[in-house]
Amino acid sequence: MIRAPLRAALLAALMAAAWTPLGLPTPAYAQLPSLGDGGGLTLGAERRLGERIARELYRDPSYIDDPVLSDYIQSLWDPLLAAARQRGDLGAELEERFAWRILLSRDRSVNAFAVPGGWLGLHLGLLAVTQSRDEVASVLAHELSHITQRHISRMVAQDSRQTPWVVGAMILGAIAASRSPDAANALITGGQALAVQNQLNFSRDMEREADRVGFGVLSQAGFEPLGFVTMFEKLQQAARLNDTGAYPYLRTHPLTTERISDMRARVPIGPTTAAPADVLHAVMAARARVLSAGGVDTLPDDRNRLL
């Protein structure tokens, strides 16, 4: 389960955010925004909220600073950022104000989550189950799109009176899912109980929007679009065969046949083939599996062995 000190610190940070001026709209503005509306938290307010959460994530014992894996993930992240910029999804002000950093966790569960202000959490367990760089990039593109489309801010704009609890439940639920599915369910359920019914529908719309925008970013960045589909299918199959809580990503990003079909329909028509064997990715996935095991703190840099 999520460690008590971390949980307490996160709750304290979120409660502090509730009482700190964050540039929230007045209750009269508490209406469901259009999908193009980023109203809610200002850029600066969202960055400050994210910094509070990120500080605690950096302090958590599961946080890992492995230069080899960090460099590899960054090599996938940078082209996605460039593609989002070229497409107009990432404006100059948003790029300047947000952090755009990825935090790695040695957690063995399959999970990734966006944090306010441009941080993204990635579990080594997710990297370990992927078979290609394109599959990893598809997850990063999806989460990046949650950030560029200001989904957290728009959740806030939906009902500003419930902001601290809804945002807190969403963030803590995503993080707690990596430790205890039961705890995550309680947090998410609590957040939903505080929200209006429209918020659940809006969340589904957010997932579809992150799929569509993320798919475009993935393709623009030069990755194989089919990676989006194969990653979705991998997660869906895992959910059917294994409901032990090892795939918390599915709890916060529920897959539907509609979403998978939509992504497959976007893949360019023509013969499709599996991604060619990628030795570097295979090494990185293996490294992630080893480092996510208990008792292993560091590994030598084995990239030169591939040269």
Language-model segments: residues:
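Active-site His/Glu-centered metal-binding helix of metallohydrolases
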Residues: 53, 140-152, 213
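Membrane-active amphipathic alpha-helices enriched in small hydrophobic residues
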Residues: 164-179, 186-195
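Acidic/histidine metal-binding catalytic segments
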Residues: 156-168, 183-187, 222-232
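Hydrophobic or amphipathic, alpha-helical segments that drive membrane association/targeting
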Residues: 2-4, 13-113, 195-196, 238-240
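Catalytic Zn2+-binding segment of zinc metalloproteases
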Residues: 134, 144-161, 179
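Short pre-active-site segment immediately N-terminal to the catalytic Zn-binding motif
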Residues: 121-138
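Extracytoplasmic and endomembrane cell-envelope/extracellular-matrix remodeling and assembly machinery
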Residues: 36-40, 51, 63, 71, ...
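Solvent-exposed coil/turn segments that connect beta secondary-structure elements
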Residues: 78-79, 105-109, 117-119, 125-127, ...
